[in-house]
């Protein structure tokens, strides 16, 4: 993931762990919605359901640098209403799709604002990482569960399956020792900022059936080691240049409400894996969509010269077979994007744990998943129209060729008939 510049406008989404809002908070034109964070229930509903991913058959090469979302560049802010269940339709209409580019001044909590002003590239090495990798079409979840259970003593694993997501704590004791009982590392970025806990003593894994793994609290070395460990469970492994990555940093503080700001995730409780689960679902969907964006970019590169070729020469060098293959690949991409429920729909866990839904939706909004999917479909539709036009043109050319053959055969038959008549006339004269 490309780190955003400190002087760029920064994107900000709020995740709140308390349904109630302060009575003395003043209403303002720009408001924020504090979303409920679930209690640390520690319960799970496990099942082995899920669907396999459909992938393009042709090998693609990676041409981009990751997710195509504006929060990586311009980092726009979509403000949310202050009340979590507000029913004032007029206020919702006024705030809908409102975008702000000076988010730091919009943060009313002084400690949060001071920390937001300080956080930047220079602090990423101080904070624990939250990284998502898309490495394959899918994972063999049953074998993964069995392997993680076998690692219980070595890595302190305790796997739980939430539909298409497999959760477990995971610790590399050989590299970091047993930190589970050490004191928290607390720092302050600013004298007026909040107390920030930067300890990574709760490393958590979220493995998604559709080929994505999200790691919380891992070092880069540990991330690479784990990716090597799960290679044997990958189905249709991606080439190294095709692997997609989303990088965030996170920290824990009780000084202000949780949020996602400039790719920094603020949590109130670092040990609450249910909150991490809801955030991880959105991040996993985002990194999977990044793969689709790369595939679409590659398809555009392959077809961008066709209109110019038609304009200059009036002909197309592609054969009908190549065009049909390209059309088939486009349909596969559309199926992956629109019909694969794990990538687009709210996860099943949100039905059984509805208190997680606001956190998931806020993260999903930050990552601009709906907008990116809509843009992907528009681009695919343009390419599809082009290829369909080429297919029809080749069909017309084939029809013209058949007509030419028929005319030629008729001409030959007429010529033969004329020759026969001439021969008969000459024979009758003799």
Swiss-Prot record:
The keyword Chloroplast does not apply. Residues 1-73 are annotated as: Disordered. Residues 18-28, 46-73 have a biased composition (Polar residues). One of its GO terms (cellular component) is mitochondrion. GO terms for biological process: meiotic cell cycle; sporulation resulting in formation of a cellular spore. Keywords: Cytoplasm, Meiosis, Sporulation. It is found in: Cytoplasm. Required for sporulation where it is believed to have a role in meiotic nuclear division. Belongs to the RMD1/sif2 family. Present with 952 molecules/cell in log phase SD medium. This is Sporulation protein RMD1. It comes from Saccharomyces cerevisiae (strain ATCC 204508 / S288c) (Baker's yeast).
